Amino acid sequence: LNTNIINLLKSTLCIIFALITLTSCNNTSTEKTVTSEEKKNVNQDIPVYNFNQFEPLIYTESDKTYLINFWAMWCAPCVKELPYIEQFAAQNPQVEVILVSLDFPKDIETKLKPFLKEKNITQKVVLLDDADANAWIDKIDPNWSGAIPFTIMFNKNERLFYERSFENLEDLENQIKKLN
């Protein structure tokens, strides 16, 4: 029964993503110190990735700790936990936080950017636009049903997966402390 439910959820996500037109962008980055003014403007350009372009962000041998959160504007539990993630990131600048929007690329200018501004989201946002959800969900975690919010926390030694929302800042902090 659980397998049928998981397959139904994956199929539903696949259908949703099949409706999205695939776009691409260059995946280039450089290390630099970010000023507070740049932090405010971090989401002026939101990159749109397919999974092959996105995958290097979640599989890195860096010494950093990463928090990658999959979310969407239409997901109430996702929106509820965004302030906790934002607060955590402000208090822990050594942790690389990336918010992965699963919204439609056509909504970036008209809905996503205004939403981020209204909610004072200053963490890096990327948009994942890949119709083959059945393939990429399993690559992220074979146990992930595809439901959001979904968060990956990792460093070069360990990976933790959370298919639930964080209840508050303390909940988020307690989970990331579990990394070696």
Sequence positions of predicted segments:
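A short beta-strand-turn-helix
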Residues: 45-66
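Structural microenvironment flanking redox-active thiols in thiol-disulfide oxidoreductases
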Residues: 82-119, 133-138
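Short, internal strand/loop/helix patches
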Residues: 115-148, 156
